[in-house]
Amino acid sequence: MRTALPPVTAAIALLACSPSSKAASGDSAAAATASSAAATPGRAARPNDPVAASRPSADPDFHPSWSRKSVIYEVNVRQYTPEGTLAALQRHLPRLEKLGVDILWLMPVQPIGVKNRKGKLGSYYAISDYTAVNPEFGKIEDFRAFVAGAHQRGMRVILDWVANHTAYDHEWVTAHPDYYERRADGSLMNARDNEGKETDWTDVAELDFRNPALRQAMIAEMKWWIDSTGIDGFRCDVAGGVPVDFWVEARTALKVRAPALFLLAEAEDPRMHAAFDMTYGWDLHHLMNAIAQGKQGTPALDAYFARDDSVYGPGAYRMYFTSNHDENSWNGSEFERMGANHKAAFVLDATAQRSMPLLYTGQEVSMKKRLRFFEKDTVDWTGPSLADFYSSVFDLKHTQAALANGPWGGPQVKLATDGGDRVYAFTRSRDDNTVLVALNFADKPTSVSYRGLTRPGGYTEWFTKASASLATDGKIEIPANGYRVFVR
């Protein structure tokens, strides 16, 4: 049983309203690639100062202590229940607690712009008022009640924040036209990609972070949610489209209000770790899609993790996933992209060094459909349950010291095998705890010989609970499209 979190403190002052958005019309991976490190023409250059350009700090005090063994769950409020409301969502909290969720990331809950709206209901990321709740979802009191309910069950809540752009009918468009980027003819500019080109996100206008007044207004809006609702942090949409130095400024200001604040960046640029606790692992996600489909072999993982080690270092949290709202809606479910290998891929995501695994709405009931992004499309919760699998993986994460997040976990060491390019194995150790992970992405079971296990002895296979004696050199039987995880 988790310890309940402190009750939400009432707000003392309301700050000015405002909005932000992201009209997704394609895979947002493009907005999260490492190429975001390059400054784009016409926007404030991202700083190359020593703080922003250095590897993520290994200082454990950078991250809130409560996040050491956390796992994260993305909530699509609109599609979660037939009602699509926060009150209806709150009824799922007991189930999510039982599943083992630590952090609930809510997709944007603010009102959606009407001008240039996509579809009937619009994009969650086309925000017309930063400090209000979409009436389709409920009222601010419903949001506060949800946060309080989550805290009572030991879960944290972070809110999706869209600083890069707002809806075209946000009040700032008329009240503060200087907050926005402009085309050569003076007209508002759609949100841009990492190369500075306008996207087809025609329902949102790009903000100009060269303006100090905009920066202060944006931070004020974020403070409002902390003060008024007691949320625990933010997932920042298209974070790579906003200058790193703004995020550093925002983190500093927000942590005065919430010292245990948690920030997640939709970006893969390592410099984001100057301000963010966690960044997206898009590159690993795309690699795992390719491995699951047989288009790449597991040796590619060696190159990935070597690069990750050199670029991010031990202090960073990296969010790994088999699905999220962008992947599901635009590229398909994990069943489409990974087939029978989706569970083995998730085991890797949950056990790899620096990883915090993400579970998306509906994955626990084998959701195979692509949820529509701009229309109502309720999740069918009667699908085949995978709750026991995901709960077991989360319990593995929670109980094994070697798998802790960031600087608290153990280093990842590849275990040599004769399994070829469809098998991958590694160990992680911390203090007297060792975890051995062996994965088989082939469609046939395999008996793998390994060598060089540095901590031989008695182990327990996590999922079957069978005892095993593992020698320095030995064999492991792995099911087709399967996994074996041994702990001691």
Indicate where each model-derived feature is located.
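Bacterial N-terminal signal peptides
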Residues: P6-A16
